[in-house]
Amino acid sequence: MESTIGIDAGGTLTKIAYLNKKMQLAFEKVYSNEQNKIIDWLKNQTGIKQICITGGKAKQLQQLLSASYKIVELNEFEATLVGVRYILKKEKYDINNFVLTNIGTGTSIHYIYNDQYIRAGGTGVGGGTIMGLSKLLTNIDHFEDVIPLTKVGSRKELDITVGDIYGGILSPIDNSLTASNFGKAAITDSNYNSSDILATIQGLVGEVVTALSLQFAETKNIDHIIYIGSTLCNNIHLQNIISSYTKYQNKTPIFLRDGGNSGAIGALLYATNKKS
């Protein structure tokens, strides 16, 4: 049986969406610099005739695959939006207007109004920042190793909070808010363990991304912020940071199951609908 798959070739990860033998949506993830593994996986699948590719490395991957498969290319954000709409419907959300924050290697932020979207902005702070700083500060360079260590880490010895600055005096804002990420590292001589450093890195990234998302949401008076991206996958620590900060500013955070695969899902759906 002929089949179609969707591929989101990102800066760090390449995500693949396809229908398995039970005709259920399934996913694969491969590091984008391991293109031989992507090719090997495709060779092991039977009946693939068409591939819809999206993402920053789409052109590069297309050159490798075009001789063997029919290739359809789709704009990265169009693919992501199709995928997000599909997941929202599947998870029974009825939301038409929202801010969509996609935390990949970097972070992009869009306004969504029904079927229209406008790029609000973005930041170079994202998953690539987590991995880059993790490598520099702890010599840990695999996301799968970062997550469990982060879970047992604490930011108390590294971040300066508002409460630390005011020292028990009534402050104008919540004492638990971060005044300076990693600020204590400059004023103490402690040796910090890897878990605490990793937790603090994620705190920095989470707060920067959330603060920017909140500013955009407030500007347009939008209540819901949907956070997606592979950086959030199994990353409860980062989700909690983003969620608590978003709620503190009276906005509603939403984390979609399989949100990190939105682009690949959208590519699959686009190619499937176009084919039919």
Curated annotation (Swiss-Prot):
GO molecular function, one term: ATP binding
Keywords: ATP-binding, Coenzyme A biosynthesis, Cytoplasm, Kinase, Nucleotide-binding, Transferase
Location of the active site: 76
Gene Ontology cellular-component annotations: cytosol
Keyword Nucleotide-binding: yes
Enzyme category, top tier: transferase
Pathway: Cofactor biosynthesis; coenzyme A biosynthesis; CoA from (R)-pantothenate: step 1/5
Gene Ontology BP annotations: coenzyme A biosynthetic process
Location within or outside the cell: Cytoplasm
Catalyzed reactions: (R)-pantothenate + ATP = (R)-4'-phosphopantothenate + ADP + H(+)
Taxonomy, superkingdom: Bacteria
Oligomer status and interactors: Homodimer.
Protein family according to the UniProt entry: Belongs to the type II pantothenate kinase family.
NCBIfam families given in the database record: panK_eukar, PRK13317.1
Full protein name: Type II pantothenate kinase
